[in-house]
C-alpha cells in the first residue's frame, strides 16, 4: 500500500486547491461534455466504479466533464466541501450524510448508490462469520495480545476512527452495546486510514476502524480483525456508501444530476455484470487509493446496489437515535432525491 501517496491525496483534498490537470480522474473532453463537475471522495476501493466511469468514457458520453476529483481523508470534510461549493458531488456513507443533515443542518440530496450489500449475503452474514468477512469492507483492527476478543471488550478502550460520529464510530458503538458493553466509555480518537494499523501495532490505540484496502493491512502487519461492524449494524439497508449533492445544486442543475446518476448507474451495472468486469473496476480504484493491483484484488470485492431507497436512510437514522447520535426522530424523506431507473 502506498501510504505516502494516500497522504498526499488527502492533504491536497483538505486544501481543495489542486489544478484540474494534476488531479486523479481529471477529464477534459469539451467536444463530448456539456456539464463540468468537481467530485469529492475518500480514496477507498469501492470508488473504483466512479473511476471506471471516467476511464471508460461513460461520463463523457452522458455529457459530463469531470474537471476535478478531490480526495479527502474522511467523509465529513468532503461533505463540508460540498456545502461550501468546493465540489459539486461527493461520496459519503449514509451515517455521515444523516449526521450532517440532522445535526449540522445541511440541506443535502442523496442521488445515487456508491456501494453496499446484497440482501442474501447480508442475511447470511448475521450467522456466518466467513460470509461477514467476505462481505463487509470495514473491520476493527486489534492486537492479538490485547485481550480484546469481543465487542464488549472495547469498553473503556481507546478506539481510532477517521472522523467522529460517522460510520466507524456509530457501527462500533452499536456492536459494543449489542454485546453488553458500554460504548459511552470508549475514548474515541481520530486518525487517517493509513495510520490506523500502525497505531494499533505500536499500542497508541487499542483498536482502529479500517476499510478496504486497509483492512487487509491489519492481518498483514500481524494484527487481527476483531469483527465486522458494518454487517452488524445494517439489517436490510443495501445502499451504504452514497453519492450526494446539495439541495440547492440539485434544484439548479437537474440535467447535470441526471447525467451523473446515469453514469454511475452504468458503471455500477458494468461492475456487477461479471467477475471480469469487476476486476476492471477494482483495478481502476488503484488510481485513487494508491494500492497495488495485487492489494486491491485481494480485498473484498465491492457490491454496487442499483438504487437508494428510503429504508437505506430511515433505518440508520432510527438506529442512530437509539444510540444517542440523534437527539430526535428524523424523517429522511427529504434527503432522498428521485433515483435514476434507466440504463
List the predicted regions and their residue ranges.
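Secondary-structure end/capping motifs
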Residues: 250-325
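Pocket-lining segment of extracytoplasmic ligand-binding domains
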Residues: 95, 184, 188-189, 194-282
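Stable alpha-helical elements in mature extracytoplasmic
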Residues: 46, 55, 74-78, 93-97, ...
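Conserved C-terminal helix/tail region of periplasmic/extracytoplasmic solute-binding proteins
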Residues: 318-343
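Bacterial N-terminal signal peptides that target proteins for export
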Residues: 2-14
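Short, glycine-/small- and polar/acidic-enriched structural segments
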Residues: 32-174, 178
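C-terminal segment of classical bacterial N-terminal signal peptides
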Residues: 19-30
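Short, solvent-exposed loop/beta-turn-alpha elements that line the ligand-binding surface or hinge
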Residues: 61, 118-133, 231-234, 302-311, ...
Amino acid at each position: 500500500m502506498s501510504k505516502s501517496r494516500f497522504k498526499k491525496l488527502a492533504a491536497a483534498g483538505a486544501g481543495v486547491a489542486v489544478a484540474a490537470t494534476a488531479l486523479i480522474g481529471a477529464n477534459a473532453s469539451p467536444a463530448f461534455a456539456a456539464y463540468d463537475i468537481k467530485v469529492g471522495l475518500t480514496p477507498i476501493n469501492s470508488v473504483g466504479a466512479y473511476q471506471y466511469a471516467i476511464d471508460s468514457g461513460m461520463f463523457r458520453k452522458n455529457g459530463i466533464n469531470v474537471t476535478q476529483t478531490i480526495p479527502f481523508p474522511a467523509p465529513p470534510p468532503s461533505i463540508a466541501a460540498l456545502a461550501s461549493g468546493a465540489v459539486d458531488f461527493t461520496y459519503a456513507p449514509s451515517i455521515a450524510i444523516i449526521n450532517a443533515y440532522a445535526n449540522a443542518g445541511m440541506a443535502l440530496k442523496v442521488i445515487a448508490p456508491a456501494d453496499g450489500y446484497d440482501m442474501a449475503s447480508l442475511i447470511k452474514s448475521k450467522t456466518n462469520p466467513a460470509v461477514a468477512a467476505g462481505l463487509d469492507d470495514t473491520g476493527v483492527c486489534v492486537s492479538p495480545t490485547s485481550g480484546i476478543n469481543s465487542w464488549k471488550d472495547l469498553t473503556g478502550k481507546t478506539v481510532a476512527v477517521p472522523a467522529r460520529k460517522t460510520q466507524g464510530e456509530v457501527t462500533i458503538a452499536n456492536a459494543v452495546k449489542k454485546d453488553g458493553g458500554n460504548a459511552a466509555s470508549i475514548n474515541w480518537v481520530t486518525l487517517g486510514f493509513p495510520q490506523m494499523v500502525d497505531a494499533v501495532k505500536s499500542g497508541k490505540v487499542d483498536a482502529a476502524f479500517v476499510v478496504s484496502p486497509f483492512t487487509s493491512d491489519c492481518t498483514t502487519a500481524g494484527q487481527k480483525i476483531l469483527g465486522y461492524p458494518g454487517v452488524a449494524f445494517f439489517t436490510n439497508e443495501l445502499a451504504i456508501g452514497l453519492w450526494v449533492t446539495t439541495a440547492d445544486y440539485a434544484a439548479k442543475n437537474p440535467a447535470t444530476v441526471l447525467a451523473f446518476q446515469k453514469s454511475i448507474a452504468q458503471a455500477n451495472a458494468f461492475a456487477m455484470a461479471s467477475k471480469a468486469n469487476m476486476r476492471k473496476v477494482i483495478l481502476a480504484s488503484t488510481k485513487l487509493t494508491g494500492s497495488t493491483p495485487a492489494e486491491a484484488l485481494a480485498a473484498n470485492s465491492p457490491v454496487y446496489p442499483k438504487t437508494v431507497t428510503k429504508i437505506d436512510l430511515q433505518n440508520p437514522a432510527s438506529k442512530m437515535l437509539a444510540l444517542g447520535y440523534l437527539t430526535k426522530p428524523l424523517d429522511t424523506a427529504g434527503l432522498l432525491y428521485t433515483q435514476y431507473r434507466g440504463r
